[in-house]
Amino acid sequence: RVMSNITDTDGKVVSAVIRVGRNGDYENLDALVMDATNNLIDEVYQDDPKLVAIVGRKLLADKYFPLVNKPQENSEALAADIIISQKRIGNLPAVRVPYFPANAVLVTTLENLSIYFMDESHRRSIDENPKKDRVENYESMNIDYVVEAYAAGCLLENITLGDFTA
């Protein structure tokens, strides 16, 4: 359930990236996320009210920057502030995650993502290092990040925003 390029009905790659913008594969991020929700997520999960669009800071900024990057009347500035404060992409709440890839969107529920810790895997060693006048702490732990139900989510990657007029 990963969309990283655009293919035709025969499965032939039309575009190596997902082009979002004028004359692209999608006109805006909202259309891309709505299409992915309707076609890549199993029908059972499509209407789940807990679905969110997990994005990095850059995609969110690229969506909302044009709203604020122009001189505006007070009423228009207030409307832009309200739109930005809602942070929605494709009619889903947008969740900004640090260190998430800049050109990707993950559509799923937050409950579908889990962290597992292996029992008794936490290892720790504390060494005193008088040569450097410090105490050195070494720690390691076996941690696994899991998507519980692949049918309840999809990943959109290789998203390129721009104007694709020839």
Could you describe each region identified by the protein language model?
Residues D8, K58-D62, A149:
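Short, catalytically relevant binding-site loops at active-site mouths
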Residues R1-N39:
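Alpha-helical scaffold segments that mediate packing/assembly in large oligomeric complexes
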Residues R1-V2, P49-K50, I54, C154-L161:
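Generic ordered-secondary-structure signal
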Residues D10-S15, R19, N23, P66-A166:
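Sequence/fold signature of self-assembling virion shell proteins
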